[in-house]
């Protein structure tokens, strides 16, 4: 997944016979006899559903070829109508050519059966921007999840992490779209199969059946649907060897039944994101923190969450994109003040040459314009409502967040309890780990402990004898920085959107605009001072093309502000994942300046693993952030 390839939208429409057809592949999306009938006959009954999911806590389906999502809607509808349904239903679906949201909504209004129209509307409401990678959608209060994998199946499938109970193989015909029926893809899909996994497909070509046999499935024909004589069903051969367990699978096993309280050390953005993700799944959480909720962020009036883009769409860019999407999904429903404000971000470059390079990068990446687009100086100023030094790019999903309100909201969820104390050492016991303070007093105990206490995690690991196998974590260091509060009326009320570049300037909160931020290498304390305020005023001037008179008259050292610490790791990526040498211990630290980007994503990543759900990141990104 290291080589980037832009998504190509589908060209589709009705042919002369009234069939919904792909122009590119010259094939129909579903039988003229009806999409719902095909989904029920081929994919549900072909996989023994709903009978097979009864008596289970969760059931996971993997699909090739999402199309308009009619198979997913039929599956979801069957789950809703079954009193003996599993508590959770998960689908992972691969789609190389996703529809844009408006197109998906329009086509579903025409093609989804009346019985599915309500569900189709919910799907369209949550449909993500057409960006490469994984997108997790949640329905029914999180009981039904859909993980969309946008991109080429051959590139995505080796990196998916899930435990699959049933496969819906629904690509276009093998002679029209051979990529979705290649033996290598079948092997990659089979790698995720549970011991009793089944499959079903309308396809019955000999090459398809042989590829499935070679991948470890026992296949047979049975009557097809909509004029097709046969379809193919299969079951995983019991003799199929288990794939080697990776660190994430071992971590899931170490968690046991998945009901015991999880201990989280740290009550900042990292710990709060993990606590929320676990609490939403009904998991009890104990958060150990030396200070009160968000006390470290008292005075941190506002912060920005903006994705990163890179010409090669590198891991940092892909992770930041995933993180911003998870943050918006997770936090949008919080109470006013705690919920982020989707105001957008203008990202300005330092000079005309860099601006041209950024515009060229956008052209190469071909991201949808409703997610990010290039803007000239006049359009940028119009979006911000204030004069700006130059143009740049505009991210529609840029979020303005109030950390001092967000963190207590996340830690205040039902099922989360807080313990005041400073963790000093971890002690291994028979059924997990104990967290002790420096006096040896027990603060918490559990089979699963997550260290989310920023730079403090390094000392905790060292004093527990767990740091030596983690040379990158051993290089983590604390970096001080400060922000400055500027009166919004001095800039005509302040910018309407986030303005970033060499520093940032945020829309006003309670009348104050945040300008930031400084980086104090080697500082002994994090403090607000005249030098830092002068730096932040200079950064604001660089973004605006000069300071307004009211701000130019301000005296550095006399302004309100906030100072704090960043935990920084080499490579500018966080460390998130299980510790292979200490089963049951997890790390979520090194968020640096992007705590908002990693908070919800890391929380969902850890919680999904502990609860046996499909992971919301591909394996190469899991490896990029793995503690080491």
From Swiss-Prot:
The gene is mnmC. Catalyzes the last two steps in the biosynthesis of 5-methylaminomethyl-2-thiouridine (mnm(5)s(2)U) at the wobble position (U34) in tRNA. Catalyzes the FAD-dependent demodification of cmnm(5)s(2)U34 to nm(5)s(2)U34, followed by the transfer of a methyl group from S-adenosyl-L-methionine to nm(5)s(2)U34, to form mnm(5)s(2)U34. Residues 265-628 are annotated as: FAD-dependent cmnm(5)s(2)U34 oxidoreductase. Disulfide bonds: none annotated. InterPro entries: FAD-dep_OxRdtase, FAD/NAD-bd_sf, MnmC-like_methylTransf, SAM-dependent_MTases_sf, tRNA_MAMT_biosynth_bifunc_MnmC, tRNA_MNMC2, tRNA_S-uridine_synth_MnmC_C. It comes from the Bacteria. It comes from Bordetella petrii (strain ATCC BAA-461 / DSM 12804 / CCUG 43448). It holds the Pfam family DAO. Its EC number is 2.1.1.61, 1.5.-.-. The lineage of its organism: Bacteria, Pseudomonadati, Pseudomonadota, Betaproteobacteria, Burkholderiales. HAMAP family: MnmC. The keyword Oxidoreductase applies. Its cofactor is FAD. GO terms for molecular function: flavin adenine dinucleotide binding; oxidoreductase activity, acting on the CH-NH group of donors; tRNA (5-methylaminomethyl-2-thiouridylate)(34)-methyltransferase activity. Its main location: cytoplasm. One of its GO terms (cellular component) is cytoplasm. NCBIfam families: MnmC_Cterm, tRNA_MNMC2. In the N-terminal section; belongs to the methyltransferase superfamily. tRNA (mnm(5)s(2)U34)-methyltransferase family. In the C-terminal section; belongs to the DAO family. This is tRNA 5-methylaminomethyl-2-thiouridine biosynthesis bifunctional protein MnmC. Keywords: Cytoplasm, FAD, Flavoprotein, Methyltransferase, Multifunctional enzyme, Oxidoreductase, S-adenosyl-L-methionine, Transferase, tRNA processing. It catalyses: 5-aminomethyl-2-thiouridine(34) in tRNA + S-adenosyl-L-methionine = 5-methylaminomethyl-2-thiouridine(34) in tRNA + S-adenosyl-L-homocysteine + H(+). GO terms for biological process: methylation; tRNA wobble base modification. SUPFAM superfamilies: FAD/NAD(P)-binding domain, S-adenosyl-L-methionine-dependent methyltransferases. Residues 1-237 are annotated as: tRNA (mnm(5)s(2)U34)-methyltransferase. It is found in: Cytoplasm.
């Amino acid at each position: 997944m290291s080589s980037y390839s832009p998504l190509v939208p589908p060209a589709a429409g009705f042919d002369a016979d009234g069939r919904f057809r792909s122009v590119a592949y010259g094939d129909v999306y579903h039988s003229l006899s009806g999409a719902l009938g095909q989904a029920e006959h081929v994919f549900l009954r072909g996989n023994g559903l709903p009978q097979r999911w009864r008596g289970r806590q969760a059931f996971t389906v993997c699909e090739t070829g999402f199309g308009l999502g009619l198979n997913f809607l039929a599956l979801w509808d069957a789950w809703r109508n079954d009193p003996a349904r599993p508590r959770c239903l998960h689908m992972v679906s691969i789609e190389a050519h996703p529809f844009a949201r408006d197109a998906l909504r329009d086509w579903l209004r025409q093609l989804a059966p009346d019985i599915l129209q309500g569900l189709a509307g919910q799907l369209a409401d949550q449909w993500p921007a057409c960006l490469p990678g994984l997108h997790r959608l949640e329905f029914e209060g999180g009981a039904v999840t859909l993980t969309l994998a946008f991109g080429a199946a051959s590139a995505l499938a080796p990196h998916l992490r899930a435990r699959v109970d049933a496969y819906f193989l629904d690509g276009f015909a093998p002679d029209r779209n051979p990529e979705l029926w290649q033996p290598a893809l079948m092997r990659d899909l089979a790698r995720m199969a549970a011991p009793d996994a089944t499959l079903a497909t309308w396809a019955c070509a000999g090459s398809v059946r042989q590829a499935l046999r070679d991948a470890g499935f026992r296949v047979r024909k049975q009557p097809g649907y909509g004029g097709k004589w046969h379809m193919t069903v299969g079951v995983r051969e019991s003799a199929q060897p288990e794939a080697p367990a990776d660190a994430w699978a071992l971590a899931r096993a170490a968690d046991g039944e998945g009901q015991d309280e999880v201990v989280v050390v740290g009550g900042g953005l990292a710990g709060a994101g993990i606590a929320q993700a676990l609490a939403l799944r009904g998991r009890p959480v104990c958060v150990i923190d030396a200070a009160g909720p968000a006390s470290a962020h008292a005075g941190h009036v506002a912060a920005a969450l903006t994705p990163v883009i890179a010409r090669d769409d590198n891991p940092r860019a892909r992770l930041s994109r995933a993180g911003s999407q998870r943050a918006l999904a997770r936090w949008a429903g919080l109470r006013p003040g705690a919920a982020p404000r989707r105001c957008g971000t203008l990202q300005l470059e330092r000079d005309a040459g860099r601006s041209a390079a950024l515009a060229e990068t956008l052209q190469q990446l071909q991201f949808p314009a409703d997610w990010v687009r290039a803007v000239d100086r006049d359009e940028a100023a119009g979006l911000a409502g204030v004069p700006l030094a130059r143009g740049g790019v505009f991210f529609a999903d840029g979020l303005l967040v109030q950390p001092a309100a967000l963190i207590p909201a996340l830690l205040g969820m039902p099922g989360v309890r807080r313990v005041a104390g400073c963790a000093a050492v971890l002690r291994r016991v028979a059924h997990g780990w104990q967290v002790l303070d420096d006096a040896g007093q027990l603060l918490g105990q559990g089979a699963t402990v997550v260290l989310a206490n920023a730079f403090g995690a390094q000392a905790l690991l060292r004093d527990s004898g767990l740091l030596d196998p983690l040379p990158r974590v051993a290089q983590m260091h604390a970096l001080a920085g400060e922000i400055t509060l500027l009166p919004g009326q001095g800039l005509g009320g302040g910018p309407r959107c986030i303005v970033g570049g060499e520093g940032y300037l945020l829309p006003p909160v309670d009348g104050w605009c945040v300008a930031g931020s400084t980086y104090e290498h080697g500082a002994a304390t994090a403090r607000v001072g005249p030098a830092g305020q002068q730096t932040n005023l200079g950064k604001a001037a660089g973004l605006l093309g000069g300071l307004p008179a009211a701000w130019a008259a301000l005296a550095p050292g006399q302004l309100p502000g906030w100072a704090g610490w960043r935990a920084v790791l080499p490579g500018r990526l966080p460390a998130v994942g299980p510790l292979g040498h200490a089963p049951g211990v997890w790390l979520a630290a090194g968020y640096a300046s992007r705590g908002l980007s990693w908070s919800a994503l890391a929380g969902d990543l850890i919680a999904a693993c502990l609860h046996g759900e499909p992971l919301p990141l591909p394996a190469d990104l899991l490896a990029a952030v793995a503690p080491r």
